[in-house]
Amino acid sequence: MLICNDKFNPKTLLEEIMALRPWRKGPFKISQIKIDSEWDSSIKWDLVKNATPLKDKIVADVGCNNGYYLFKMLEYKPKSLVGFDPGVLVKKQFEFLAPFFDKEKKIIYESLGVEDLHEKYPNAFDVIFCLGVLYHRKSPLEALKALYHALKIKGELVLDTLIIDSPLDIALCPKKTYAKMKNVYFIPSVSVLKGWCERVGFENFEILSVLKTTPKEQRKTDFILGQSLEDFLDKTDPSKTLEGYDAPLRGYFKMLKPSKR
């Protein structure tokens, strides 16, 4: 949890926070108010925070949402931090949070998507985090290519995506929805993901962790609107989504942009 102990009018502060719902990433604590977000993002952060050194590095978070991971990265003293997310609400959340958690204004927030990286930030970053984005892209290869070109030579990508548990070179392409999400297009096996990454030029593909999503990590709270994980799973068999697919399984990976290709 990110904590700010400054004193504010609790009623006014809570009203501002609730007006910015839904809070997907967090939690945060401002004064005596805990923003109990849908996702306990500390679980994911604990899996990736030591993936690669960030000190004095130029670092990007692609799909940064409200900046939770960016605020966490400040503790590791990177040279610079840039977050990318085209979402309007999440930028408003970031602008609300930044005065509490980035008082020195070190974070740059760009309202851009992964597809904008190649043109606007070529060969720019030592490290890119791309967490929970790839399966939302209609062309995952193009997304990986954009990430590749935004990295410097010897730069590293830390990637989190939904995967399917299969030894085969296959990817799930949901017919209409996956766990009620309409914007999930491809969920690869690890071997397919490795092939995609190598095809665009990455090397040293490394599995950091594989973890099932549970209600401990994603659940309904007063700080979101609508449903959450338990509503997306088959109530008679929570190992399946409502559509009959395997329940969410996430893989965490690291890879390198080599010096020569």
Swiss-Prot record:
<comment type="similarity">
    <text>Belongs to the class I-like SAM-binding methyltransferase superfamily. CmoB family.</text>
</comment>
<dbReference type="GO" id="GO:0016765">
    <property type="term" value="F:transferase activity, transferring alkyl or aryl (other than methyl) groups"/>
</dbReference>
<dbReference type="Pfam" id="PF08003">
    <property type="entry name" value="Methyltransf_9"/>
</dbReference>
<keyword id="KW-0808">Transferase</keyword>
<dbReference type="InterPro" id="IPR029063">
    <property type="entry name" value="SAM-dependent_MTases_sf"/>
</dbReference>
<feature type="binding site">
    <location>
        <position position="25"/>
    </location>
    <ligand>
        <name>carboxy-S-adenosyl-L-methionine</name>
    </ligand>
</feature>
<keyword id="KW-0819">tRNA processing</keyword>
<dbReference type="GO" id="GO:0002098">
    <property type="term" value="P:tRNA wobble uridine modification"/>
</dbReference>
<feature type="binding site">
    <location>
        <position position="250"/>
    </location>
    <ligand>
        <name>carboxy-S-adenosyl-L-methionine</name>
    </ligand>
</feature>
<feature type="binding site">
    <location>
        <position position="39"/>
    </location>
    <ligand>
        <name>carboxy-S-adenosyl-L-methionine</name>
    </ligand>
</feature>
<comment type="function">
    <text>Catalyzes carboxymethyl transfer from carboxy-S-adenosyl-L-methionine (Cx-SAM) to 5-hydroxyuridine (ho5U) to form 5-carboxymethoxyuridine (cmo5U) at position 34 in tRNAs.</text>
</comment>
<comment type="subunit">
    <text>Homotetramer.</text>
</comment>
<feature type="binding site">
    <location>
        <position position="63"/>
    </location>
    <ligand>
        <name>carboxy-S-adenosyl-L-methionine</name>
    </ligand>
</feature>
<dbReference type="InterPro" id="IPR027555">
    <property type="entry name" value="Mo5U34_MeTrfas-like"/>
</dbReference>
<feature type="binding site">
    <location>
        <position position="44"/>
    </location>
    <ligand>
        <name>carboxy-S-adenosyl-L-methionine</name>
    </ligand>
</feature>
<protein>
    <recommendedName>
        <fullName>tRNA U34 carboxymethyltransferase</fullName>
        <ecNumber>2.5.1.-</ecNumber>
    </recommendedName>
</protein>
<feature type="binding site">
    <location>
        <begin position="114"/>
        <end position="115"/>
    </location>
    <ligand>
        <name>carboxy-S-adenosyl-L-methionine</name>
    </ligand>
</feature>
<feature type="binding site">
    <location>
        <position position="135"/>
    </location>
    <ligand>
        <name>carboxy-S-adenosyl-L-methionine</name>
    </ligand>
</feature>
<dbReference type="InterPro" id="IPR010017">
    <property type="entry name" value="CmoB"/>
</dbReference>
